[in-house]
């Protein structure tokens, strides 16, 4: 394999030239009125949204091949995909995946507590809807706990699914990936979306997917992965102002790693062995959207999800209720509501100090935000959220954010927002000793939530006809980080575990800091050629604890992405994409071992899309065009080499 690594300096020069080239841009025919809902809880133009927010549109998702949502997020500024192979996760602004809240149509989802030893990165994204069912993806960079509560420290990813239609329609996509290196596993996938009316007031929506990735014959590479999901929604229009929706879905992920193929063959505690993990998720939700005329608009849902790790005999049931009312009052747009969450964990295998196998907890919260139009061109959003939890008591999360439309082209926005992550169930249970090779981990009932304070300032430019650019600076203080320390003998009485490692327990002691800048550019070069790019600079440093002075995790300081799209004819579109990832510190075998610096790398992909008919489109692409090698010895993870993708989309 080859190595193609442009320096950060050359990339910065390229970016500067691209910005200067905007003076020669021609007007495009489309208008840019992108609407978002995640920043404030109601629809608004993206320039006016009180947050740093990016949108991946339906058109973006259809233009090329993405393995999953994680793959699509690689071009978003501020987003770092950590790890590699099929164990990737999503980090926003330097915060780990535990601090990224994932929503589907505004409903939170998480199954991480069925994987207490981080034995399943990449699983969370596998529960998301197939790409054919997604209308757009909204990504908020920075804390949003005022509206969304725990876990929204790094940011929020909201998957917005497609809406019902008044006539039957749908899409089917069939695709295959063939690896040039036959030691890497091929992949086949199919996903579909169909919707239509059952009566004047009742409509149905069904979507699903199946994916099979063959196991690599590369140690630490991709394991054998099978993914299946099916979701149905019934929408009932009570009257023009009120709608009810019932949703139910089932998902399954099976992952297998075998010694002699992708599984580790040496350096294990004891004998290295095959792994066979089976994860399941079932969910059901009922929701109501109402227009109460002069009072405002409401959005209410009740969701139950059951997540199971069958291989380790663990399951967690999450029940969430949330109701929000958005009310215009004079120059104010008021959003307020309540949210409740009940968690019930059953774990029959990992507690090594008592017979306890069940933990549960209930949280309640109230929140309020006000967008105040102080002037025609300036809006100030401020608000707060009060959470109450029987484990840690009460926690308040405030936010203040301003948006100033200087003129029709320029917008300045910025503010201060806060985030928190509540301790997980095992972390606060005193008679729970979580099995771990580095020392069994005792729960601590005195833990407080982890917190962050984010400050940011953005400058945005948009002509409304395709040309747009933005520059954002941010600074984040992360406090009360929960970490493991040696446990006093009067607390951890069980002594060393089966591997001879002394017990540990969790405390709030660590602090960290992240800061950086994010830049974006969309440039219509001609009526048929468009360039889009993003650049992210991130610095992170742990301020206390055993790893003071080190980055938080797998965090490259420099990320750069550029995509060139050419509408060659009415039926033919071609594209090329460059993704540069700067050097980064990688943990070798876990946080307790020495770190090493992984070198930078660049991937270049290219492909075409051709409309065979009005309803059938064929797509082809070459990924990792120059066969850049990313191996475990140098990077701590494995990525695919050159591979070929062929897909067929059928609309009806």
Curated annotation (Swiss-Prot):
- Its chief place of residence is membrane
Instruction: Outline the extent of the TBDR beta-barrel domain.
Output: 167-652
Cellular component per GO?
cell outer membrane
Q: What name has this protein been given in UniProt?
A: Iron-regulated outer membrane virulence protein
Q: What does this protein do?
A: Involved in the initial step of iron uptake by binding ferric vibriobactin, an iron chelatin siderophore that allows V.cholerae to extract iron from the environment.
Matches recorded under NCBIfam families: PRK13483.1
Q: How does it sit in the membrane?
A: Multi-pass membrane protein
Q: Which GO terms describe its biological process?
A: siderophore transmembrane transport
A Pfam family recorded for this sequence = TonB_dep_Rec_b-barrel
Q: Which GO terms describe its molecular function?
A: siderophore uptake transmembrane transporter activity
User: At which positions is motif TonB box?
Assistant: 33-40
Which PROSITE patterns does the entry mention?
TONB_DEPENDENT_REC_1, TONB_DEPENDENT_REC_2, TONB_DEPENDENT_REC_3
| TonB C-terminal box (motif): residue ranges | 635-652
- List UniProt keywords, sorted A-Z: Cell outer membrane, Ion transport, Iron, Iron transport, Membrane, Receptor, Signal, TonB box, Transmembrane, Transmembrane beta strand, Transport, Virulence
Region forming the signal peptide: 1-25
């Amino acid at each position: 394999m080859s190595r193609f690594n442009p320096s950060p300096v050359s990339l910065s020069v390229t970016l500067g030239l691209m910005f200067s080239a905007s003076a020669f841009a021609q007007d495009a025919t489309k208008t840019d009125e992108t609407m978002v809902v995640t920043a404030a809880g109601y629809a608004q133009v993206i320039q006016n949204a009180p947050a740093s927010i990016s949108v991946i549109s339906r058109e973006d998702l259809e233009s090329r091949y993405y393995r999953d949502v994680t793959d699509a997020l690689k071009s978003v500024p501020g987003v770092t995909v950590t790890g590699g192979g099929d164990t990737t996760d999503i980090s926003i602004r330097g915060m780990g995946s535990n601090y990224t809240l994932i929503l589907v149509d505004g409903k939170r989802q998480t199954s991480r507590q069925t994987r207490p030893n981080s034995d399943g990165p990449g699983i969370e994204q596998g529960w998301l809807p197939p790409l054919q069912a997604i209308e757009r993806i909204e990504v908020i960079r920075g804390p949003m706990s005022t509206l969304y509560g725990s876990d929204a420290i790094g940011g929020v990813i909201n998957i917005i699914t497609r809406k019902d239609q008044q006539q039957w329609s749908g899409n089917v996509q069939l695709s295959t990936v063939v690896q040039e290196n036959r030691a890497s596993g091929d992949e086949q996938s199919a996903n579909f979306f169909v919707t239509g009316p059952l009566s004047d007031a009742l409509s149905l929506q069904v979507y699903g997917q199946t994916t099979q990735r063959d196991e690599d014959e590369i140690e630490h590479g991709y394991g054998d992965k099978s993914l299946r999901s099916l979701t149905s929604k019934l929408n009932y229009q009570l009257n023009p102002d009120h709608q009810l929706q019932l949703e139910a879905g089932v998902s399954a992920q099976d992952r297998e790693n075998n010694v002699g193929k992708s599984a580790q063959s040496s350096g294990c505690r004891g004998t290295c062995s095959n792994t066979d993990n089976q994860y399941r998720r079932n969910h059901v939700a009922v929701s109501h959207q109402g227009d109460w005329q002069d009072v405002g608009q409401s959005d209410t849902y009740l969701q139950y999800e059951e997540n199971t790790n069958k291989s380790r005999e663990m399951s967690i049931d999450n029940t969430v209720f949330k109701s929000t009312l958005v009310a215009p009052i004079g120059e104010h747009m008021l959003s307020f509501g309540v949210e409740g969450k009940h968690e019930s964990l059953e774990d029959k295998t990992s507690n090594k100090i008592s017979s306890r196998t069940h933990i549960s907890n209930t949280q309640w919260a109230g929140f309020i935000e006000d967008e105040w139009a102080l002037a025609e061109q300036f809006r100030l959003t401020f608000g707060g959220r009060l959470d109450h939890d029987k484990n840690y008591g009460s926690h308040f999360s405030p936010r203040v954010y301003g948006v100033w439309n200087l003129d029709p082209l320029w917008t300045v926005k910025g503010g201060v927002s806060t985030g928190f992550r509540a301790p997980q169930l095992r972390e606060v249970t005193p008679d729970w000793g979580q099995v771990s090779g580095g020392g069994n981990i005792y729960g601590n009932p005195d833990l407080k939530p982890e917190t962050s304070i984010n400050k940011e300032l953005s400058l945005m430019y948009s002509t409304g006809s395709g040309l747009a650019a933005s520059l954002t600076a941010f600074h984040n203080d992360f406090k009360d980080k929960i970490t493991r320390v040696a446990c006093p003998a009067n607390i951890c009485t069980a002594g060393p575990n089966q591997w001879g490692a002394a017990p540990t327990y969790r405390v709030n002691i660590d602090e960290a800091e992240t800061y950086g800048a994010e830049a974006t550019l969309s440039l219509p070069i001609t009526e048929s050629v468009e360039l889009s790019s993003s650049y992210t600079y991130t610095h992170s440093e742990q301020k206390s604890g055993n790893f003071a002075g080190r980055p938080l995790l797998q965090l490259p300081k420099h990320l750069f992405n550029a995509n060139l799209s050419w509408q060659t004819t009415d039926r033919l579109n071609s594209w090329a994409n460059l993704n540069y990832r700067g050097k980064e510190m990688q943990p070798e075998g876990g946080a307790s071992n020495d770190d090493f610096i992984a070198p930078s790398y660049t991937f270049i992909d290219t492909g075409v899309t051709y409309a065979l008919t009005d309803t059938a489109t064929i797509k082809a692409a070459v990924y990792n065009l120059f066969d850049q090698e990313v191996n475990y010895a140098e990077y701590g993870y494995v990525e695919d080499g050159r591979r070929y993708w062929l897909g067929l989309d059928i609309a009806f």
